[in-house]
């Protein structure tokens, strides 16, 4: 089984990917974690590293090339990243999930997780990060990140807690996969 989980920052992709990986005994590969680690290794914030990635396309291109290779060569994985679904486009055997939530909800979640700055600062930072990513994806691949038509499942994580959202996703995934 191969699953991609995508969504904007703070939508719950990391949490739900971990829960899905546990439920289905799948390996979790998170490009967001790779990106955050690369930023830390350079002593940069996510916003600073995102700005660097805007100037240095090799950062995104390397991460995305790696994602594409993974989704086309490995089984029993969950690939979690903003573009994971797009990296699996054309693969009907891969279950593509988009997790969504309103901006203010996402910013509250990020602020709670990061515990570093005020809500207004986090809002500004998140909007800038999303603007940066949207621009890069459009420039590099012609991808409109707001077009959700490639996804098999789109779910709003604001409506339910993480476990309720997981239960809904499991029912949908099991229906798509069929009996084992």
Curated annotation (Swiss-Prot):
Q: Any idea where this protein resides? A: Cytoplasm
Pfam families from the UniProt entry: Cytidylate_kin2
One annotated GO biological process:
pyrimidine nucleotide metabolic process
> Which keywords does UniProt give here?
ATP-binding, Cytoplasm, Kinase, Nucleotide-binding, Transferase
UniProt GO molecular function: ATP binding; CMP kinase activity; dCMP kinase activity
Which residues are connected by disulfide bridges in this protein? Answer: none
Binding positions for ATP per the UniProt entry: 7-15
Q: Which SUPFAM superfamilies match?
A: P-loop containing nucleoside triphosphate hydrolases
Q: Quote the cellular component terms of the Gene Ontology held in the record.
A: cytoplasm
Q: What's the Enzyme Commission number for this chain? A: 2.7.4.25
Reaction catalyzed:
CMP + ATP = CDP + ADP; dCMP + ATP = dCDP + ADP
UniProt record similarity statement: Belongs to the cytidylate kinase family. Type 2 subfamily.
UniProt xrefs under NCBIfam families? cyt_kin_arch
Please give the name of this protein. Answer: Cytidylate kinase
Q: Which source organism does the UniProt entry give?
A: Methanosarcina mazei (strain ATCC BAA-159 / DSM 3647 / Goe1 / Go1 / JCM 11833 / OCM 88) (Methanosarcina frisia)
> What lineage does UniProt assign to this protein's organism?
Archaea, Methanobacteriati, Methanobacteriota, Stenosarchaea group, Methanomicrobia
């Amino acid at each position: 089984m191969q699953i991609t989980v995508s969504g904007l920052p703070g939508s719950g992709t990391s949490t739900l990917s971990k829960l899905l990986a546990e439920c289905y005994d799948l390996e979790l590969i998170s490009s967001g974690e790779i990106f955050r680690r690369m930023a830390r290794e350079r002593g940069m914030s996510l916003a600073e590293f995102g700005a660097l990635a805007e100037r240095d396309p090799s950062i995104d291109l390397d991460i995305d090339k790696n994602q594409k290779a993974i989704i086309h060569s490995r089984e029993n994985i969950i690939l979690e990243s903003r573009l994971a679904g797009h990296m699996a486009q054309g693969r009907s055997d891969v279950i593509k999930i988009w997790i969504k939530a309103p901006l203010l909800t996402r910013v509250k979640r990020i602020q709670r997780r990061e515990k570093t700055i005020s809500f207004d600062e986090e809002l500004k930072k998140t909007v800038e990060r999303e603007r940066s990513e949207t621009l890069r994806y459009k420039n590099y691949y012609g991808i409109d990140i707001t077009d959700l038509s490639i996804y098999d499942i789109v779910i709003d994580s604001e409506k339910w807690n993480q476990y309720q959202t997981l239960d809904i996703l499991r029912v949908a995934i099991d229906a798509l996969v069929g009996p084992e």
